[in-house]
Curated annotation (Swiss-Prot):
Family statement: Belongs to the major facilitator superfamily. TCR/Tet family.
Gene name, Swiss-Prot/TrEMBL: psiT2
Protein name according to UniProt: Major facilitator-type transporter psiT2
Transmembrane regions listed in the UniProt entry: 87-107, 125-145, 148-168, 174-194, 220-240, 322-342, 357-377, 388-408, 424-444, 460-479, 493-513
Region called Disordered, residue ranges: 1-20, 260-299
Length: 528
């Protein structure tokens, strides 16, 4: 063949080879793209067990809401002045969160080193025990001590967030995270229902609970039931919850592979005698894969400083602080506002009706998490949805401040009752208020997804812990701050007793401004 002929063939052969290679690569890319779109199967059993443990935390926290003000009043610490009850009940709720602040980071860091199970299960059991004992309190000091102890152990909550993140990936997050977020509103629906229904059970239901013990301790039963639910969850966790800490999971897989290889090598040696090839195969099979080797190199958790200086983590922490402060304040103020008599600046609802109102709010939040949140997370930008949720708070506090003037329009000072028409309007306003207040619930699962998106996987519990610390500090401060603000406003009749409304709306607007930083940081990262 002539050189010219050979030269003329070479480009064609080369082009054919490139075409085949490009076709092969395109098929591979298409297959990879399709594979990425297929959601990873959800570990239903593990998530079910984890949800049973997480389910009790909001119940334990919220079962106090309907009766805590009455409990404090019965203890006598407020000296019979209902205007000061809110201050002391706020302290009870604050010290629980203070205990969490003191232990969250320590427990989260510990779980990043020794595993999730050894920290999560004992902590949940301890919270259950101190919750049951709280119902036996006979003094304000005893109430404070028991709630602090429960709060110290409740600091393990971020570990649950980490386990959920480790059991899921980006392909099934949009489904699992809203389902996980559903646990909190369900707990917030059941907790107040338990508290409002079972307080003074011996008086309400003498045929069923007419025991002298329950007459002496009328708040024991609503504390004991959440304890029992927590014990059931811990029992399930002890027998069925698997360890998810990445370093421990990798070590277990490596050990299982070594055992399997040793067993095969042993049988092969027995049949044919040991050879260099067999030893080489065993050595290769127990070696780390490239992915495992990379994980092994990067398995050391990030330092606290590295997490804090990260702009995205700072934005999430700051926004989370406002979110938790405003969310908890709305619940605390609503409970106190409803408990306070109309002439003292409130609405004057009994504890059982307050419990029903919180239960309705929990059902609303549950339906939103189940029906709306998954679609929202798939359709819209997470940072923008977060900002939208924060916009609900100024409206919540503004509407809440209108309830007392509305109640006063139909209030009879002689009979201490509200006209039925006014009562209907009042309940309608409360329904709208609760709906607005539960819009922000979507922000909590979004916060969890943003943490996973921006934090190193080997420091996930620590990152969750840092965000949870900032949120828990807010939860520790807001019951005392908001209830004291309410008491000061009403007792001194500042702005007609509504100074607290003006201040809470102002804080809400500051929270909206802070939430915009998440969108700014996210956009900047995408541009890089």
């Amino acid at each position: 063949m002539s050189p010219e002929r050979s030269a003329s063939l070479e480009p064609d052969e080369h082009s054919s080879l490139l075409s085949d290679t490009a076709s092969y690569i395109s098929r591979d890319d298409l297959e990879d793209s399709k594979a990425k779109q297929i959601p990873t199967p959800i570990p239903k059993k593990q998530l079910g067990v984890l949800f049973s443990i997480r389910f009790t935390e909001p119940i334990i926290y919220s079962h106090l809401w309907p009766y805590i003000n009455q409990f404090v009043n019965d203890i006598g610490v407020a000296d019979g002045n209902p205007r000061y009850v809110g201050f002391y009940s706020g302290l009870i709720e604050s010290v629980f969160a203070c205990g969490e602040v003191c232990s969250i980071f320590m427990l989260s860091r510990l779980s990043d080193r020794i595993g999730r199970r050894p920290v999560l299960l004992p902590s949940a059991l301890g919270v259950a025990l101190f919750t049951a004992l709280f119902g036996l309190s006979t003094s304000f000091t005893m109430m404070l001590v028991l709630r602090v102890c429960a709060g110290l152990l409740a600091g393990a909550t971020p570990i649950v967030h980490s386990v959920v993140s480790e059991l899921t990936d980006e392909t099934n997050n949009a489904l699992v995270v809203p389902l996980y977020g559903l646990i909190t509103p369900i707990g917030f629906a059941i907790g107040p229902l338990i508290g409002g229904t079972l307080e003074h059970a011996a008086t309400k239901y003498p045929n069923v609970f007419g025991y002298d013990f329950l007459r002496k301790y009328p708040y024991f039963l609503p504390s004991f039931v959440p304890c029992c639910l927590a014990v059931v969850g811990v029992t399930f966790g002890y027998f069925f919850l698997q360890e998810t800490l990445p370093s421990i999971v990798r070590a277990k897989k490596r050990l299982e592979r070594q055992k399997s290889t040793s067993s095969i090598s042993s049988r092969t040696s027995t049949l044919y005698g040991a050879t260099d090839d067999h030893n080489r195969d065993a050595s290769e099979s127990t070696a780390l894969s490239p992915e495992e080797a990379e994980d092994e190199i990067d398995s050391k958790p990030q330092s606290i400083k590295a997490l804090i200086v990260d702009p995205s983590m700072r934005a999430i922490m700051g926004s989370g602080t406002f979110l938790m402060f405003l969310y908890t304040s709305s619940d605390v103020l609503f409970s106190l506002y409803c408990f306070t008599a109309v002439e003292d600046g409130g609405v004057g609802l009994p504890p059982d009706e307050i419990g029903y109102a919180f239960s309705v709010a929990g059902v609303i939040a549950m339906l939103m998490q189940l029906c709306i949140t998954p679609w929202v997370l798939r359709t819209f930008d997470k940072a923008k949805v977060y900002k939208f949720c924060m916009f609900s708070f100024p409206l919540v506090f503004a509407l809440m401040g209108c309830l007392n003037p509305l109640a006063q329009t139909g209030y009879n000072e002689v009979s201490k009752t509200i006209h039925p028409t006014t009562t209907g309007l009042l309940y309608a306003a409360i329904a709208v208020l609760l709906l607005l207040a539960r819009v922000c619930v979507m922000a909590f699962p979004i916060s969890m997804m943003l943490i996973k998106q921006n934090a190193d996987k080997n420091s996930l519990a620590t990152a969750n812990g840092l965000v949870q610390v900032s949120m828990t500090i807010a939860r520790a401060l807001c019951p005392t701050v908001s209830s004291s603000l309410f008491a000061y406003s009403t007792s001194n009749n500042i702005l007609g007793g509504h100074l607290w409304v003006l201040i809470m709306v102002t804080i809400s607007l500051a929270g909206v401004w802070q939430s915009m930083s998440i969108a700014r940081v996210t956009k900047r990262k995408e541009e890089l």
